Amino acid sequence: MMQESATETISNSSMNQNGMSTLSSQLDAGSRDGRSSSDTSSEVSTVELLHLQQQQALQAARQLLLQQQTSGLKSPKNNEKQRPLQVPVSMAMMTPQVITPQQMQQILQQQVLSPQQLQALLQQQQAVMLQQQQLQEFYKKQQEQLHLQLLQQQQQQQQQQQQQQQQQQQQQQQQQQQQQQQQQQQPQPHPGKQAKEQQQLAAQQLVFQQQLLQMQQLQQQQHLLNLQRQGLISIPPSQSALPVQSLPQAGLSPAEIQQLWKEVTGVHSMEDNGIKHGGLDLTTNISSSTTSTTTSKASPPITHHSLLNGQASVLSARRDSSSHEETGASHTLYGHGVCKWPGCENICEDFGQFLKHLNNEHALDDRSTAQCRVQMQVVQQLEIQLSKERERLQAMMTHLHMRPSEPKPSPKPLNLVSTVTMSKNMLETSPQSLPQTPTTPTAPVTPLAQGPSVITPASVPNVGAIRRRHSDKYNIPMSSEIAPNYEFYKNADVRPPFTYATLIRQAIMESSDRQLTLNEIYSWFTRTFAYFRRNAATWKNAVRHNLSLHKCFVRVENVKGAVWTVDEAEYQKRRSQKITASPTLVKNIPTSLGYGAALNASLQAALAESSLPLLSNTGLLNNASTGLLQAVHEDLNGSLDHIDSNGNSSAGCSPQPHIHSIHVKEEPLIADDEDCPMSLVTTANHSPELEEDRELEEEPLSEDLE
């Protein structure tokens, strides 16, 4: 009976499809009505209906399969016919639900689903179950991974904490070991050893204090000597005769210095405030060596008394200067709101804050002492360098004094700077002058117009600053002059002391193939000399003028264009012709020699007169020196009057023979100085051949000077 009912349901499945559609439509309508009506909350939703339909279909399918299995043993033919309609169902899907016979009969009677629909539903349910299983497995894997990551992070954090704790423990152990080692290595010293160490420190401090005092005395004496040279103060001859080396020995004895040191710094076992207070006196003592140079000009009696009364007066002068600094808010170590202690540069708003900073940061300690020693070494190095430079300057001045250049008239007055420098040189070389000091003068140079000048505007109206041309005077090659001073001419706005022809020749000779175009010559001028980087129109015109004027420059046409070369033979011939061309010029050479000697003597007299205030005040000028100056003055005026009256004087009309006793090595007169005015000797008679050459060369240079 069960088999027949199953076959009937299968055969009539096509007829009941319409009924199924109507049933589903009714169910949908019911679900819509359930949604629309909010009052009937007991109605079944569409999801529950679908679930119920699936369960019913599954139950029906299971029942059919059971029937087919039971009937398949009896009728294999019917089993073969119904094999395409069988739906494979897994045992996992069959086990969970249990269908009662009554429910199975109701499903069969109602004929809700066809076998095809049942098969489709079973496949869908299998797919859904597979997806659920996959999702569950994926979710489990993710949870396991997250759990593993959390465990790993916790383990890493624990390991890091353990490592940090171990490192801290190791550091603490190392520190403890180091402290123990230090305690073992440095046992408590014996009281006698402590006293010895304190005595050694005190002795070192005393030695350092003595060095500072000696340096301060030297600086004060040097400043006093500078003021004495300039005539600002006067010292009796009894004191001026004292040598400089004996002055620093006029200080305190070692016992007095030690007592003074104890008064300033106190006992060595005092508190830090006392030490800092002692450091204030030290710093003021150190700084007073430089502040005394600035305040001594306004108050020279202070330095004068310091030399007379010894070191005690020096300390009192320093205290006075420090009080003056506090009132005037001026200190050598303080300027523009910044501490000028070496390597400090701390910003201080006012002078009081600077004093606090000076007492706190730069007290008497090892660091400040080391910095002071470094500063002493710096000063010593500078003094050594200064002495070398002074020796070089003295050699240069000696050389220039023995080989003076030809005097060139100019409306400009004498150069005061060179005069002061030569006067200092004469003071240093004079046997009666004061000993040479190793420091530069700190006071400004004052105009030396306190006495009557030997060279007056009425006697020599056209004597000016003398400009030398080394390459033309002594036949020194230009490269030897430019090579040592290459960086100077390259960076300084100073005109090189050479003619344009000499510079052009040097530019061409420095090139690889000994030939340059005009633009290359221009570039050499601007590259080598900073002076020619301005006023290009003026000096370029002069370069073109000299290239076309002189025969030693040859213009050559080649593939590149027009280049300029140098005919060295013509260049040397041109230089030799400038001496032998004019007989009148040769005739005037003795007169020029005499005039040069007279001018050299007059310069010496003027330099001697520039130091007359010092000599007159110190009593070092004797009658013989005054007589010599008067004789030189008369000889100079006589020689100048003779030259003015007879411009073409001969060698027999030269000045007196004692002027020739001055070892003057004079050079022949060269008429190639474009930027220098012509000599007084050549104003009366000069070569007409060279006159045209000079006018052509001086025209562009006059524009350059303007």
UniProtKB/Swiss-Prot annotation:
Biased amino acid composition, Polar residues? 1-28
- Which residue stretches belong to region Disordered? 1-45, 275-305, 672-706
Q: Which gene encodes it?
A: foxp2
PROSITE patterns for the chain: FORK_HEAD_2, FORK_HEAD_3, ZINC_FINGER_C2H2_1
Cleavable signal peptide: none
- Which source organism does the UniProt entry give? Xenopus laevis
Q: Which GO terms describe its biological process?
A: caudate nucleus development; negative regulation of DNA-templated transcription; negative regulation of transcription by RNA polymerase II; putamen development; regulation of transcription by RNA polymerase II
Q: In its keyword annotation, does this UniProt entry include DNA-binding? A: yes
Q: What does the entry list under GO cellular component?
A: nucleus
Q: Which intervals carry biased composition (Low complexity)?
A: 287-296
Task: Provide the residue span(s) of the region labelled Leucine-zipper.
Answer: 379-400
Protein name, entry field: Forkhead box protein P2
- Give residue spans, biased composition: Acidic residues: 690-706
High-level lineage: Eukaryota, Metazoa, Chordata, Craniata, Vertebrata
Keywords (alphabetical) are: DNA-binding, Metal-binding, Nucleus, Repressor, Transcription, Transcription regulation, Zinc, Zinc-finger
Function recorded in the entry: Transcriptional repressor.
Oligomer and partners: Dimerization is required for DNA-binding.
Stretches annotated zinc finger (C2H2-type): 337-362
Protein localization: Nucleus
Residues the UniProt record assigns to the DNA-binding region sit at 495-585
Where does the protein principally reside? nucleus
Free-text comment on this protein's domains from its UniProt entry? The leucine-zipper is required for dimerization and transcriptional repression.
Q: Positions of the region Ctbp1-binding?
A: 413-417
Query: Which InterPro entries does this one have?
Result: FH_FOXP1_P2 (IPR047412), Fork_head_dom (IPR001766), FOXP (IPR050998), FOXP-CC (IPR032354), TF_fork_head_CS_2 (IPR030456), WH-like_DNA-bd_sf (IPR036388), WH_DNA-bd_sf (IPR036390)
